[in-house]
Amino acid sequence: MIAANQLLEKQSIISNNLANISTTGFKEKFIFAIQNHNVKNLYNSDKKITKEYYNLSPGILRYTGRNLDLFIKDDGWLTVKDTNGQEAYTKNGHLKINSKRKLTIQDNEVIGNNCNIIIPKNIILKILSNGVITSVKNKHKHIVETKIGSLKLVQLPSQDLIQNENGLFYLKKNNEINKKHTNTIKHSKKIRVQSGMLEESNVNASKNMIEMISNARQFEMQMKMISMCDQNAEYANQLININN
């Protein structure tokens, strides 16, 4: 039954991957069942532990020409505040301006680098490669650029992150990570963004479909085996009752 449950868990993850195949910046998730050997050779020494991993390779880049679309390069992440007010990280650079003139990504407020970003009306917005946001105005035949704020860009390795159901990434609750990172991750000057482009989901549709079909067949076999075991147990009980 453990194997069947693991297959169901795999199917759930694959279904989520396929559901997000068109989600900007989505990162493919997969799961492995790892054999855990007890060196002391005690009872129940061999147990399978499931481990979740993320494919953080970049998706295909799509040119949009939109000033509020960003491609976050390398191991950089955009910082947002989720609906619970918690700091989270994303590769989705499709920014929008809400009714309060704040930048959002999928209704999550974008966090500024030591600043509160409010976008003025009737301006041309420009985001530089270092995350600085400027307004561009034409005054008396002269182009005037004014700094509005700066995006908080962070540099985090994939092993320090875990993805939530909302699609956002968070720091793992791990002692080693807490030693390496403080409660608030600092802005990194190394990270660069490119305006006018978006990173597509990196989900491999054909691979996930093949795995889904394979898992479905394995699950069917597991159910047949469980059914056969139940039948054998029932026959054995009947024989015992007859002999008694």
Swiss-Prot record:
Looking up Pfam families in the UniProt record yields: Flg_bb_rod (PF00460), Flg_bbr_C (PF06429), LlgE_F_G_D1 (PF22692)
Compartment(s) = Bacterial flagellum basal body
The family database entries (InterPro entries) matched by this protein are listed as:
Flag_bb_rod_N (IPR001444), Flagellar_basal_body_rod_CS (IPR019776), Flagellar_FlgE/F/G (IPR020013), Flg_bb/hook_C_dom (IPR010930), FlgE/F/G-like (IPR037925), LlgE_F_G-like_D1 (IPR053967)
Q: Which residues cross the membrane?
A: none
GO CC, sorted alphabetically, is: bacterial-type flagellum basal body
Indicate where this protein is primarily found. Answer: other
What are the BP-aspect GO terms? bacterial-type flagellum-dependent swarming motility
Q: What's in the keyword line of the UniProt record?
A: Bacterial flagellum
- Give the matching PROSITE patterns: FLAGELLA_BB_ROD
Q: How does it assemble?
A: The basal body constitutes a major portion of the flagellar organelle and consists of five rings (E,L,P,S, and M) mounted on a central rod. The rod consists of about 26 subunits of FlgG in the distal portion, and FlgB, FlgC and FlgF are thought to build up the proximal portion of the rod with about 6 subunits each.
Family, according to the entry, reads as follows: Belongs to the flagella basal body rod proteins family.
Name of the protein described by the UniProt record: Flagellar basal-body rod protein FlgF
Organism, as annotated: Buchnera aphidicola subsp. Acyrthosiphon pisum (strain APS) (Acyrthosiphon pisum symbiotic bacterium)
